[in-house]
């Protein structure tokens, strides 16, 4: 699906339905929206194109999120990757899938652990200058103290998953984006 076409073939729609939460109708409408974003008609979009989506443009984590779904690591996301990424953030998407993505957002170097520096980097991206470095460091320290049950000084996926589940945070809402694929 590298080159942009005006319509999707039925087998392409079915293939995408298998890896997403969207209906056939929603996929067709998402394709129209994708084509509007793909102004150069190259069959893929980049970070700047994603910024044209109002529901995503204000998210300071957007470049990090896109990098997770950019499986080719070329700065481009094709339609299937686009739908799969939006599916993950659908309000009805599986909580465990959302937490896996959130873990990947924090695990910047993709080593399977979230370090103190990675938590600090992500937190800084989220709050900008609204908190001082000292406040951010305090939050990072508290997070590690509560979530790092084995005292490794970093979080593995089970630590992270358990801390999200026990923190009372609602991962379903936190990782949901309400958007209208019918625009």
Swiss-Prot record:
The EF-hand domain, residue ranges: 25-60, 64-92, 94-129, 135-170
Keywords, sorted A to Z: Calcium, Lipoprotein, Metal-binding, Myristate, Repeat
Annotated lipid attachment (N-myristoyl glycine): 2
Keyword GTP-binding: no
Binding site for Ca(2+): 107, 109, 111, 118
InterPro entries: EF-hand-dom_pair, EF_Hand_1_Ca_BS, EF_hand_dom
UniProt cross-references to SMART domains, sorted A to Z: EFh
GO process terms (BP): calcineurin-mediated signaling
GO cellular component terms listed in the entry, alphabetical order: calcineurin complex
PROSITE patterns per the UniProt record, alphabetical: EF_HAND_1, EF_HAND_2
Top-level taxon of origin: Eukaryota
Gene Ontology MF annotations: calcium ion binding; calcium-dependent protein serine/threonine phosphatase regulator activity; phosphatase binding
Assembly notes: Calcineurin is composed of a catalytic subunit (A) and a regulatory subunit (B).
Protein family per UniProt: Belongs to the calcineurin regulatory subunit family.
Protein function: Regulatory subunit of calcineurin, a calcium-dependent, calmodulin stimulated protein phosphatase. Confers calcium sensitivity.
Protein's recorded name: Calcineurin subunit B type 2
UniProt organism field: Dictyostelium discoideum
